[in-house]
């Protein structure tokens, strides 16, 4: 692929995870680095923050890389940031949902409605208040009906791509609760999140030799698998 200037790199995704972890563990990790060490990391991040991306949820990875750099005092290309943010807004389809490419699935929830609230905290509320307000409005709109995607036990209705992410669909509640004007019901959000976690962790086939298995349900038994699981709990 050498010489392909349109190529996007998977590392763009992973650098987003990296900056979130550095934010969460800021005092324990980031703040212990010297200025020179931080500069090395910042230069590494910049290569992906300003680099090529995929025109869908990936734009949020670039946005968070740049927002982290800005938050830590490094210069960023604000025009690129604005272009990404406006593009994300253009993917909005209504009722709290974003198109990811031409698809609707849980990526709208665990990507758009999680990374956008984090971006608001790091950058948007201060630097792009109009866009931040729209992200907040969209997340709050999703909260009006999103609980209906889970059953009475909080189990996730597996749908769309990457069911391997299992209970990640509940992260949209976490994203909303980060907002300045959150409308999520904290108690209901906790109940659903706990139930969805138990949906997988209480299964006999969740672990193999102590390590979580790949897939949603390894046996892919669907409804029967859920009934079997409930019978084991009684």
Tell me the role of every PLM-derived stretch.
Residues 1-177:
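Aromatic-lined, polymer-binding surfaces characteristic
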Residues 177-234:
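Extended polysaccharide-engagement surfaces of secreted carbohydrate-active enzymes
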């Amino acid at each position: 692929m050498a010489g392909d200037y349109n190529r996007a790199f998977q590392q763009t995704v992973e650098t987003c995870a990296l900056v979130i972890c550095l934010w969460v563990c800021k005092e324990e990790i980031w703040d212990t680095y010297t200025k020179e060490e931080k500069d090395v990391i910042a230069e590494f991040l910049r290569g992906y923050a300003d680099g090529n991306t995929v025109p869908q949820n990936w734009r949020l990875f670039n946005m968070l890389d740049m927002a982290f750099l800005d938050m830590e005092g490094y210069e960023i290309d604000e025009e690129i940031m604005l272009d990404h943010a406006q593009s994300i807004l253009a993917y909005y389809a209504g009722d709290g949902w974003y198109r990811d490419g031409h698809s609707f699935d849980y990526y709208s929830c665990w990507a758009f409605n999680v990374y956008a609230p984090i971006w608001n905290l790091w950058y948007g509320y201060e630097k792009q208040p109009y866009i931040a307000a729209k992200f907040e409005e969209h997340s709050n709109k999703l909260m009006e009906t999103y609980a209906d995607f889970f059953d009475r036990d909080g189990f996730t209705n597996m749908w769309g791509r990457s069911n391997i992410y299992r209970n990640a669909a509940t992260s949209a509640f976490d994203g909303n609760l980060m907002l300045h004007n959150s409308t999520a019901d904290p108690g209901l959000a906790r109940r659903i999140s706990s139930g969805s976690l138990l949906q997988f962790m209480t299964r006999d086939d969740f672990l193999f030799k102590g390590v979580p298995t790949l897939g949603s349900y390894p046996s892919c038994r669907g409804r029967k698998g859920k009934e079997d699981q409930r019978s084991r709990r009684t």
